[in-house]
UniProtKB/Swiss-Prot annotation:
Protein name per Swiss-Prot or TrEMBL: Protein O-mannosyl-transferase Tmtc4
Entries under Pfam families matching the protein: TMTC_DUF1736, TPR_11, TPR_12, TPR_16
Transmembrane stretches, start-end: 18-38, 92-112, 136-156, 159-179, 186-206, 236-256, 286-306, 315-335, 347-367, 371-391, 401-418
GO terms of biological process kind: endoplasmic reticulum unfolded protein response; protein O-linked mannosylation
GO molecular function: dolichyl-phosphate-mannose-protein mannosyltransferase activity; mannosyltransferase activity
Entry function: Transfers mannosyl residues to the hydroxyl group of serine or threonine residues.
TPR repeat spans: 444-477, 478-511, 512-545, 546-579, 580-613, 614-647, 648-681
Keywords (A to Z) from UniProt: Endoplasmic reticulum, Glycoprotein, Membrane, Repeat, TPR repeat, Transferase, Transmembrane, Transmembrane helix
């Protein structure tokens, strides 16, 4: 008896080790060391002050959406996931803003979910297949499936991973209490559902999945429909789940003031189409597309919004054959649900978690691969169920069974290689956007993101090319039009810049960033009154637009209205303390006015929010040097040079400090370093070095006399 227990324990440990190993081979093994924040990570984490500000702003975390905007704002997508945001914030507080460790935690959560899935399937009662084989094969497929790459390798996929964990825990609770779902179990499941909804809204479907699982595990499907209905009406736990779900939904809507999100056409062209038939047919086709991505995850793309999926405009579109095929399978499953309950259970566990993303409510995407993380649990169950049913039906044909085993091993190998390849794409934005261009060459958003990244990398030729291509594919793409205008402005083509920014405003008149950028162009043209009017228009559409206040300050500076300039810069940093240019302008103005003590005090405030910003540190060092606090100034200059070692100005000013300090040899070395970096830019260093050497020469001559 003990030997059997030991063997079972050993077998269990081996199975779990294999599953974890598959996860690590697909996503880990040193592949995370060079990981960066990509795509949605930038908005939700890097630029989200709820995540990367200390001390913790609890009010903001529980009143803002996942992207850092107020939940009650008209611009908010209403994606309320405060516990996910809080997880990111805790990681930032403990370990800093590092994509590698955040993605590693995602990988650990994926390992945990894989093991929970294996444990869940082992505990099921499904008479037509071996649950032991069903468990290990389904969990292995779940571990290796490429559709999970976005959820695991994209940091914002944490919401899906936590939803998946809570979903599986609730299903395990349901199985453990089959036939005796009392108030304690029901209450715990509803509590976990409420917690899950604070990680991801789709967790509201958990009670429905639990009811589905309990229905099949209790064998209610054997009864006649009349008897089933009578029994289900008397199940207090099912009624409790229904009322609890409605209560959670009501509370969730109340928290956002019962306002619905508004999405642009670029986010979801299907939902914005004016024809009911086109919307309906296209939405049905998208359902099949999601299934196809799980069935054949070769073509994967980080954004399917513009140009990836053509709308289905009539019933004769051949793509609807896939829709007919899917509903045929569902119909066959319904007709055989008493004979093949495992298939029906797997199908239900695939469909139920997907309902919030299925088009029942308007969402801000066409297809989002990470939303398939939890539905893929049911898909993996269904796929392996079909394989085992086919395999077990071929008992007399050993060659065929051998061929099936080989095919299964090949499938797992291909899946693992594809997942590893896709995980590499998600390491940085350049690889990610390049991979998307191969899948969706006519996706305007892909071209837009490539252009944006090229601009950041200084490749303006490439940026111009892809911005123009994005606009060619989608002429009313307001963000692309505005950014192209900004690019022309940086190249001094102000008239062309104004033209494109005005086109952006024609496409979207309530676009605050476009109004602000129009103001910047008009200010550069000397049209100060028009620029001021544009800035005020931007503030009309976004009242707390910190960057706009900064640019208004610059406008007043150009008009020599110094008090108003200072006031607007101060207002900008009050709204958003992470604006280094605004802080630098404030400090420079105070320094120029001779208010060095005020400049030091303000620089301390600035460094609390931006401790490693070189512009603020540099100005503080200059002020300290003027006040003859040489030791402290020297330390800050050295820190600035450590952060940016190839900046001639920093070495020059360090030389000036030593010059004033009568540290002649150190001054000479600093000046020479500045000249060696860039002789053309080190004019001041050359002049100061020449003066210093001449002075030393004169002193030497005097000494000789």
């Amino acid at each position: 008896m003990l030997d059997l227990v030991h063997k079972a324990t050993l077998h269990s440990m081996v199975c779990q080790a294999i599953l974890v190993l598959i996860c690590l081979l697909c996503y880990g093994c040193g592949g995370l060391s060079g990981a960066k924040f990509v795509f949605d990570d930038t908005v939700a984490i890097v630029k989200n002050r709820d995540v990367n500000s200390l001390p913790t702003n609890w009010t903001a975390i529980f009143t803002h959406d996942f992207w850092g905007a107020s939940l009650l704002s008209s611009d908010s997508h209403k994606s309320f996931r405060p516990l996910t945001t809080l997880m990111f914030h805790c990681e930032y507080a403990l370990l800093g803003l590092s994509a590698a460790h955040m993605k590693f935690l995602n990988l650990l959560l994926h390992c945990v979910n894989t093991l929970l899935m294996w444990r869940l399937i082992r505990s099921l009662y499904v008479p037509e297949v071996s649950t032991a084989r069903w468990a290990i094969l389904s969990a292995a497929l779940f571990a290796a499936h490429p559709i999970h790459t976005e959820a695991v390798s994209g940091v914002v996929g944490r919401a899906e991973l936590m939803f998946g964990m809570i979903h599986l825990l609730c299903l395990l609770l349901t199985v453990a209490n089959t036939g005796r779902l009392g108030p304690q179990t029901g209450g715990l499941i509803m509590l976990l559902t409420a917690v899950g909804m604070l990680f991801k809204e789709s967790a509201v479907t958990i009670p429905m999945s639990c009811v589905l699982l309990d229905y099949f595990q209790n064998g209610y499907y054997h009864l006649r429909f009349k008897d089933q209905w009578s029994l289900l009406r008397t199940r207090i736990s099912y009624l409790f789940y229904l009322l609890g779900t409605l209560g959670l939904l009501t509370a969730r809507l109340w928290w956002q003031d019962f306002e619905t999100p508004t999405f642009k056409e670029v986010d979801n062209p299907v939902a914005h189409n004016e024809h009911v038939l086109t919307r309906g047919l296209s939405q049905q086709y998208l359902l099949v597309m999601n299934i196809w991505l799980m069935l054949c995850p070769h073509w994967l793309c980080y954004d399917w919004a513009l140009g990836c999926v053509k709308l289905v405009t009539n019933i004769w579109d051949l793509r609807l054959q896939g829709v007919i095929g899917f509903y045929s399978i569902v119909l066959v499953a319904l007709m055989n649900f008493r004979r093949l309950p495992g298939m029906m259970l797997a199908l239900g566990l695939m469909i139920v978690p997907f309902l919030p993303a299925s088009g029942i409510i308007c969402v801000g995407f066409v297809i989002a691969e990470r939303t398939l993380y939890v539905p893929s649990i049911g898909f993996c169950l269904l796929s392996i169920y079909g394989f085992l049913y086919w395999y077990d039906s071929s008992t007399e044909n050993t060659h065929w069974r051998t061929a099936l085993r080989i095919l299964l091993m090949l499938l797992f190998s291909v899946m693992m290689v594809r997942t590893r390849q896709r995980a590499t794409d998600w390491l940085n934005e350049e690889q990610l956007f390049k991979s998307a261009l191969q899948v969706c060459p006519d996706n305007a958003k892909v071209h837009y993101n490539i252009a944006r990244l090229a601009t950041d990398m200084g490749n303006n030729t490439k940026a111009f090319q892809h911005y123009h291509r994005a606009i060619e594919l989608y002429p009313n793409y307001e963000s692309a039009l505005m950014n192209l205008g900004n690019l022309y402005r940086e190249h001094g083509q102000l008239s062309t810049a104004e033209e494109y920014i005005r086109l952006a405003l024609q496409a979207y008149p309530a676009f605050p960033a476009a109004w602000m950028n129009l103001g910047i162009v008009q200010s550069a043209q000397g049209k100060y009154d028009k620029a001021l009017a544009s800035y005020e228009k931007a503030l009309k559409y976004r009242a707390n637009f910190a960057v706009c206040y900064y640019n208004m300050g610059n406008l007043y500076l150009e008009q020599k209205r110094y008090a108003e300039a200072l006031h607007h810069w101060q207002h900008a940093v009050a709204l958003n303390p992470r604006q280094p240019k605004a802080w630098a302008n404030i400090l420079t103005m105070l320094d120029n006015k001779g208010l060095q003590d005020d400049a030091l005090r303000i620089s301390n405030q600035a460094l609390q929010h931006l401790p490693n910003d070189v512009s603020i540190l540099f100005i503080r060092a200059n002020v300290l040097g003027k006040l003859k606090h040489y030791t402290e100034a020297e330390a800050i200059y050295k820190r600035v040079i450590e952060l940016e070692p190839h900046n001639t100005l920093y070495h020059t000013n360090l030389g000036v400090l030593y010059h004033r300090w009568d540290k002649t040899q150190e001054a000479i070395e600093a000046y020479r370093t500045a000249i060696s970096i860039s002789a053309a830019r080190a004019t001041t260093a050359r002049e100061n070095l020449s003066k210093l050497l001449k002075r030393l020469e004169r002193e030497a001559q005097v000494m000789q006399r």
